[in-house]
Regions:
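Position-specific recognition of the canonical hydrophobic site in helix A of tetratricopeptide repeat
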Residues: 39, 66, 70-73, 100, ...
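Alpha-helical segment of the N-proximal tetratricopeptide repeat
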Residues: 27-60, 70, 74, 142, ...
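Structural marker of alpha-solenoid helical repeat scaffolds
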Residues: 57, 91, 125-129, 163, ...
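Structural signature of tandem alpha-helical TPR/SEL1-like repeats
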Residues: 40-53, 74-87, 109-121, 146-159, ...
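Canonical tetratricopeptide repeat
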Residues: 33, 67, 101, 135-139, ...
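Bacterial N-terminal signal peptides
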Residues: 6-16
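Helix-start (N-cap) detector for alpha-helical repeat units in TPR-like alpha-solenoids
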Residues: 28, 62-63, 96-97, 130-134, ...
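Terminal, low-structured helical/coil segments at or just beyond the last alpha-helical repeat
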Residues: 25-29, 342-399
Length: 399
């Protein structure tokens, strides 16, 4: 699944949902009053029983379906709420706030394409520049964000941010969308807006650093990540980001310290463990690197660099079978990595397998050495969150 839903990326919009102030057609029967009272008391099971009894007595009325959907949504049973809201809409598509509550249930349940459809209908009828239009613009932008349609999210979140000059979470979401859609100047522009709201935002410094790294400004990126570390040394990934930049510049001793600092914050941070091991290997400390690499491949066996480094260590210590296993795995995971084929060629030559060695050396010579993976791609696998926000709740007065 996509980054925004799959990994716990939490959607957040600091927006209060007031909802429309209309009501569904109400009957004055006793059963309905009982159901409403139980619902207001938070007695969900009893309220559901009462609303189902009301539904049985009045099967053509949308109100029982709407309230049953609301009860499910209040218990975070969003997928169960959706068909109930849809049934209510089928009976009366003009019930105030009902379509919005359906859209919110779809959004929170991860059915973002369905949510977009409902938000689009609502946006058409919302008054321009109204609070409702602002709310729907944000929700639409965040739905695109969740679908990884970052380029689609940018203009919507930019429009919403222009209408809310003090909304920091909204600007962080916008900055992430700009970054992941490669609109790098947009990231820097939003970064300066964020600084006016919070001059000590480590996350904003990191975003600016990632953008500068994409723009090949290593010095500027490093400066931004140093500022982020100073602003909040506990910010997830902040030490890894700085360490990785230093590692790309071959400043291995300082890079190792940053990877160690990230591991102090998160002991299972596989990327920091991997690059700490590689930094130690680059500093001729294979005995320090080996246990780290062995742990990395247990945590994440898809890391080609870990297998390459293990292959180097085993090869240098004469453990040729182990070296062959690791280098072969590295070649399968990253077949266009020159160093893997060069190391395999050396190992085959050591084993007296001249033909196999020639094949690997030929592969190495025909490949252009891959450029080091950039910081954005590295951090895309480990970034714990995007902008944190709250999704508006379903309107209990207008289910």
């Amino acid at each position: 699944m996509n980054p925004a839903l799959q990994l716990g990326i939490i959607f957040a919009m600091a927006i209060a949902h007031s909802g429309a102030q209309g009501t569904v057609t109400k009957s004055s029967d006793h059963q309905r009053e009982v159901a409403l009272a139980l619902e207001q008391q938070g007695k969900y099971a009893e309220a559901e029983t009462a609303w189902r009894a009301d539904l049985k007595a009045h099967p053509s009325r949308p109100e029982p379906y709407a309230h049953l959907g609301l009860l499910e949504a209040q218990q975070e049973h969003y997928k169960e709420a959706v068909p109930l809201y849809r049934k209510a809409l089928a009976l009366n598509p003009n019930v105030p706030a009902l379509r919005l509550n359906l859209g919110l249930a779809l959004f929170k349940g991860g059915e973002l394409k369905g949510a977009l459809h409902e938000f689009a209908i609502l946006l058409k009828s919302a008054a321009p520049d109204s609070p409702e239009a602002q709310r729907l613009t944000i929700l639409t932008g965040m739905a695109h964000y969740g679908l990884t349609d970052y380029a689609e999210a940018v203009p919507l979140l930019k429009q919403a941010a222009a209408r809310d000059q003090q909304n920091l979470p909204l600007r962080l979401a916008l900055a992430h969308s700009c970054l992941w859609s490669k609109q790098l100047q947009c990231v820097l522009d939003v970064y300066h807006e964020i600084l006016t709201l919070n001059s000590e935002s480590a996350e904003a410094d990191m975003l600016a650093g990632e953008a500068l790294d994409e723009m090949k400004d290593s010095a500027g990126a490093t400066k931004m990540f140093r500022a982020a570390v100073q602003a909040n040394p506990k910010e997830p990934n902040v030490h890894f980001g700085l360490g990785y930049l230093l590692w790309t510049q071959k400043i291995y001793p300082e890079a190792a310290k940053e990877f160690q600092a990230e591991l102090a914050n998160d002991p299972d941070h596989a990327q920091s463990m991997l690059y700490l091991a590689d930094a130690n290997l680059q500093m001729n400390q294979p005995e320090v690197a080996l246990p780290l690499l062995q742990k990395v491949v247990k945590l994440d066996p898809s890391q080609s660099l870990a297998h390459l480094d293990l292959g180097i260590i085993y090869s240098d210590s004469g453990k040729n079978d182990d070296a062959m296993r690791e280098l072969t795995l590295a070649a399968k995971l990253k077949p266009d990595e020159v160093n893997v084929h060069w190391r395999l060629g050396r190992l085959y030559r050591t084993l007296g397998k001249k033909d196999e060695a020639k094949v690997e050396f030929d592969k190495a010579s025909s490949l252009n050495k891959a450029v080091d993976e950039d910081l954005l791609k590295k951090m895309g696998n480990t970034h714990p969150r995007a902008a944190e926000t709250k999704v508006p709740q379903a309107d209990p007065t207008n289910p």
